[in-house]
């Protein structure tokens, strides 16, 4: 994917929502399956944090097409994943600041907070 500027390691919920609406991004949920069952952002692909290394090729392929917006509950695990992905050469990824919790408060209040 060609991008004129270097993508930041983190992205605000509003900016993420804009990229998703434009079809330029895909959501990657790195929480555990039981958390995904509690609440999720529509269209997100569940890849628990522990499974990310085994699914690196899948993530690399997705990042060739769109920006990966990685999220978790509050943004800690997702930032760890984004830092790891960057070290593997996956540049088109960013962690959702505040995770699904801030997304619920700023973008979509229909997403349950927990």
Predicted regions and their residues:
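Rhodanese-like catalytic fold shared by cysteine-dependent sulfurtransferases
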Residues: 1-25, 33-67, 76-114
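Short, surface-exposed ligand- or partner-binding patches at beta-edge/loop junctions that are enriched
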Residues: 71
